[in-house]
């Protein structure tokens, strides 16, 4: 049965076109995906991300547990509210999910995991947590709203309790704080996002979500759907689980080497596979590609390289760049003379460094200059 977020009726009242996304009835756009994309790049837009799963972990050994569970090191988290992006791996080094972990207290950490992987994540985390005496609590009582764009933080801070605005203004990237709105709504405010823009992801009680969404609307924050969220994250070079990586792909093959911490004396699930892959080199790599000819790059298209075939993973027409862009997984070392097979025609591709877009602007080399 399709699940609905607490904001479902609100989306429909705003004229949203709804689609099934990982078993959830979600807005794809509210009229124009293109306008919503530009709104986030130029001002501020908001997304209902209440389908994401918040998992609270409690116990005296929770840090020890996360040192074992995650490929990145929670030992980097020393200040309450600090966040870390990481992969959770299987024993073969494959990515079960990518997630954000927040350090709350020494016996309380919070995870935010993907919606489509909820069941397998909860099962895996629960199985691994048992021997560490860690209590796993899914917070289905929460909703989540992401407000993103150059003006996003200002518009959100204007809605906070005046006693909290100074702390919220000083909040660094990849950090969170517990705060409240002017109306007394408890908010977990995280300076994170999935668009490449600045902003906040806000976790709040479900019963307060509609009122807070409407307060953001009154601030001039425009709603944006999953369509714009996808083109924004793609321009920003951010992976989508299930499309750009899965449990048969290691972080080294997903462009996520930077999330692996091979710190001494820490044994984490999948570590031995990653160590040997680092020493020998991963057989495949994830790259960004741009197509200068007209057309659209789509998932599953074959990429031809001097070292063998690869494939397009996420692909779209970039509204900011005016060109087709994509992630591709290709044999290691293949970044020259790339071509994509589009209905039997071989079209040239250029490999570029991530991200395609930063702070609303094309990154050097992306446009071919």
Swiss-Prot record:
It comes from the Bacteria. InterPro entries: GCS_T, GCS_T_bac, GCST_C, GCV_T_N, GcvT/YgfZ/DmdA, GcvT/YgfZ_C, TrmE/GcvT_dom1. One of its GO terms (biological process) is glycine decarboxylation via glycine cleavage system. One of its GO terms (cellular component) is glycine cleavage complex. GO terms for molecular function: aminomethyltransferase activity; transaminase activity. Belongs to the GcvT family. This is Aminomethyltransferase.
């Amino acid at each position: 049965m399709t699940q609905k977020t607490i904001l479902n009726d609100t989306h429909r009242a705003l004229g949203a076109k709804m689609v099934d996304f990982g078993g959830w009835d979600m807005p794809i756009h509210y009229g124009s995906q293109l306008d919503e994309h530009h709104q986030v790049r130029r001002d501020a837009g908001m997304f209902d991300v209440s389908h994401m799963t918040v998992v609270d972990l409690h116990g005296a050994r929770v840090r020890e547990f996360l040192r074992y569970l995650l490929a990145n090191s929670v030992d980097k988290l020393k200040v309450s509210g600090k966040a870390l992006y990481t992969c959770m791996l299987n024993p073969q080094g494959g990515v079960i999910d990518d997630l954000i972990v927040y350090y709350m207290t020494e016996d309380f950490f919070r995870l935010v995991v993907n919606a489509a992987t909820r069941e397998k994540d909860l099962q895996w985390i629960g199985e691994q947590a048992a021997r560490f005496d860690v209590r796993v609590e899914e917070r289905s009582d929460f909703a989540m709203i992401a407000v993103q764009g150059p003006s996003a933080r200002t518009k959100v801070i204007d809605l906070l309790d005046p006693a909290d605005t100074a702390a919220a203004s000083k909040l660094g990237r990849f950090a969170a704080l517990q705060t409240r709105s002017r109306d007394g709504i408890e908010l977990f405010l995280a300076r994170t996002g999935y668009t490449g823009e600045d902003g906040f992801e806000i976790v709040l009680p479900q019963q307060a979500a509609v009122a807070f969404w409407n307060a953001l609307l009154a601030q001039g924050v425009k709603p944006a759907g999953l369509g714009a969220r996808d083109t924004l994250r793609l321009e920003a070079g951010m992976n989508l689980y299930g499309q750009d990586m899965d449990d048969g792909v290691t972080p080294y093959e997903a462009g996520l080497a930077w999330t692996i911490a091979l710190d001494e004396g820490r044994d984490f699930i999948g570590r031995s596979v990653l160590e040997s892959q680092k020493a020998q080199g991963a057989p495949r790599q994830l790259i960004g590609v741009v197509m200068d000819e007209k057309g659209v790059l789509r998932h599953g298209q074959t990429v031809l390289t001097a070292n063998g075939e690869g494939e397009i993973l996420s692909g779209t027409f970039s509204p900011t760049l005016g060109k087709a862009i994509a992630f591709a997984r290709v044999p290691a070392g293949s970044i020259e003379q790339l071509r994509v097979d589009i209905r039997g025609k071989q079209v040239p591709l250029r490999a570029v460094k991530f991200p395609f877009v930063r702070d609303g602007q094309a990154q050097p080399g992306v446009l071919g200059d």
